[in-house]
Regions:
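Conserved ABC ATPase "signature" region
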Residues: 8-25
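Conserved ABC ATPase signature
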Residues: 29-33
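Hydrophobic anchor residue at the start of the ABC signature
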Residues: 43
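Catalytic Walker B motif of ABC-type/P-loop ATPase nucleotide-binding domains
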Residues: 54-58
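ABC transporter nucleotide-binding domain
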Residues: 70-151
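C-terminal coupling/interaction segments
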Residues: 140-183
Length: 183
């Protein structure tokens, strides 16, 4: 914005604040902003100069569900004009706002495809999750625990059940607990 006439600077600031749903807060003190508003303000600062490539690291971390939905709508709008690279562990962000998904393990690319293709690839896979990691799963994803093989399954009583209809949460939690394969 350096060198831009002041009226144009104000217009650009208003435009960017509008993109992140903060137009009404132009004169508010940042101290009064919620965590989600501060996150959206950070996004606004990032896009102010209309960069061709935007890189975000865990941009929706710490947002409540409502703010996360607002964030997704903002990202969908932004990806029309910019290339967006997002590092995230929040799988609901992936299926909503990404066209391509790259899965890294210790800095190496182990998968690169659309979220839908990768999701289809995991359909029917057996997930063995170490017993010590079971407590990290959301309780609604645990239907059966086999203490002998130290695995969990979605059906009862098969020790190594096949996930026939996995959700993105299955991908996330299984990936989260498999020693970093899907990180």
């Amino acid at each position: 914005l350096k060198g831009m006439p002041e009226p144009l600077i104000e217009d650009e600031i208003r435009r960017v604040l509008g993109l992140v749903n903060l137009s009404e807060n132009l004169d508010d003190k940042i101290k009064s902003f919620s965590g989600g508003m501060k996150q959206r303000l950070a996004i606004a600062q990032t896009i102010l100069n209309s960069p061709e490539i935007l890189i975000f690291d865990e941009p929706s971390a710490g947002l409540d569900p409502f703010e996360r939905e607002q964030f997704k709508r903002i990202m969908v709008r932004l990806k029309k004009d910019s290339i967006i690279i997002i590092s995230t562990h929040i799988v609901s962000d992936i299926d909503t706002i990404t066209d391509d998904l790259i899965i890294l393990n210790k800095g190496s690319v182990i998968a690169n495809d659309s979220p839908e293709a990768l999701f289809e690839h995991i359909r029917g896979m057996v997930w063995d999750i170490p017993k010590e990691d079971i407590g990290l799963l959301p309780i609604e994803n645990i239907y059966y625990e086999d203490t002998k093989s130290k695995t969990i399954s979605k059906t009862k009583p098969t020790p190594n059940a096949v996930i026939s209809e996995p959700t993105m949460n299955d991908l996330y939690f299984c990936g989260q607990l498999d020693g970093g394969v899907f990180e």
